[in-house]
Amino acid sequence: MHTVFLGTSDFAVAVLRRLAASAHRPLLVVTRPDRPRGRGRRLGRPPAAVAARELGIEVLQPPSVNDDDARAAIASARPEVVCVCAFGGLIREPLLSEHLMLNVHPSLLPRWRGAAPVERAIMAGDVETGVSIMRVVEALDAGPVCARRAEPIHRDDTYGMLAPRLQRIGGDLLVEALDDRPPFADQDDAHVTYAEKIAPGERVLDPARTPAELERVVRALTPHIGARIDRDGAEPLGVCAATIRADVGDVAPGELSTRDGALLFGAAGGALELREVKPAGGRAMPAGAFLRGHAL
């Protein structure tokens, strides 16, 4: 089947590679323009652009996928299906009506429509998530679904552990959908939840929340975004790994303290033990190493 692929992020790359290894190898990859990256703010290519060039697939990076030139380039490839995964840009009419578009979305729709479904599933304490293949429509992640597959969220899963499993499922499920062309079923609007983009303030661990809630925030934001503790009169402290210490009740909410060599952060009804931290401007390290070189 002739396909075109729209994708940008690292998540999209794994799906692109699986698609390229199938009978539905894309004739064209459309991704976002290069943008400044890192501390030096040098222009860097999107991961999908790098992967497409490695695979020998033509790459298009238009200012907007909806402009006339981009639409003409996609049409010239004569795709039977346009495959979308983590593209990061709005797809509008008339492009939507010009092609059948299938989106790889890392949640069990209609739960967690939106920009951060993997993070929100971990934060909410969901015991499972998954991948859905849906037809792209104008409304956000609201199109009918033709395939879905569940994946458990393990007790210690971070984003960095869960996302690769969902990438593999997404690639396999997309290829299966292209092979088998299963029927579409509308989503149940009564069960819709939204996965809003992670706001900067959500990175900060709020001591008014329970240790269990904070531990899930740490896992959901590790390693790509990162949780942190804001400290009065000191640089913020990144938190890369933590465990719940409900047995500790004498650490005030918001207080950083030590007990028997453990670094603790007080929260509502208990404490969070910080196992791995990242000082401002430094590298991640075990909490014990941090305590040996830094004063609280």
Show the residue positions of the predicted features.
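Residue-level signal for inorganic ion chemistry
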Residues: 7, 29, 52, 174, ...
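Donor/substrate-binding cores of folate-linked one-carbon enzymes
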Residues: 81-195, 199-200
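Amphipathic, non-transmembrane alpha-helical secondary structure
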Residues: 13, 17-21, 72-75, 93, ...
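Active-site-lining helix/loop region of Rossmann-like oxidoreductase modules
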Residues: 176, 180-231
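Active-site-proximal cofactor/substrate-binding loop regions of enzyme domains
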Residues: 2-5, 29-30, 38-47, 51-131
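N-terminal Rossmann-like dinucleotide-binding module
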Residues: 1-39
